[in-house]
Amino acid sequence: MKIYTRGGDAGETSLFGGERVRKSAPRVAAYGEVDELNSVLGIARAELEAADLRAMLETIQSSLFDLGGELATPNAPERSAKGKAGPRVAEDDVVELEGWIDRLETELEPLRNFILPGGARAAALLHLGRTVCRRAERAVISLGESESIDPLPIRYLNRLSDFLFVLARAVNKRAGVTEPQWIGRER
């Protein structure tokens, strides 16, 4: 199978089910943001030394493929009710993220100030992933304002952003990198 079809050369793409839409459509923007997030997390995973953390990100990347597929499927909530939905994020995925957050937070000192994104290279990439995740979340929210979607992907992305923040902090802690604190300037 060839990677190119020329079918998108006029600015349209096919959703699951065959419907053709503009590449600028909110649904395409939403799953495109999720795809970008997945790529950023792949870069971060390549920089991680700890096998347990790499495994977490690999699990998340698989879930993001499921989420992208769900977003690329019009009427996914209705299809799910009829037992016709494909892979998708589940409540268990949100619970898993919460468990990982709780576990990693036991390694960290409580925050008393805002911190500046950065530190070890992997942590900096995770902070980048966190901000891309928030953008993806906003795109999915925007999609939900114009079309019927399951609210679970929004919850998943919200929790994932929290997880990426905590994971970045844990990576810095394990690397012995002090997190720079934000010090506001009075003007």
Predicted regions and their residues:
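Phosphate/pyrophosphate-binding loop motifs in nucleotide- or prenyl diphosphate-using proteins
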Residues: M1-R187
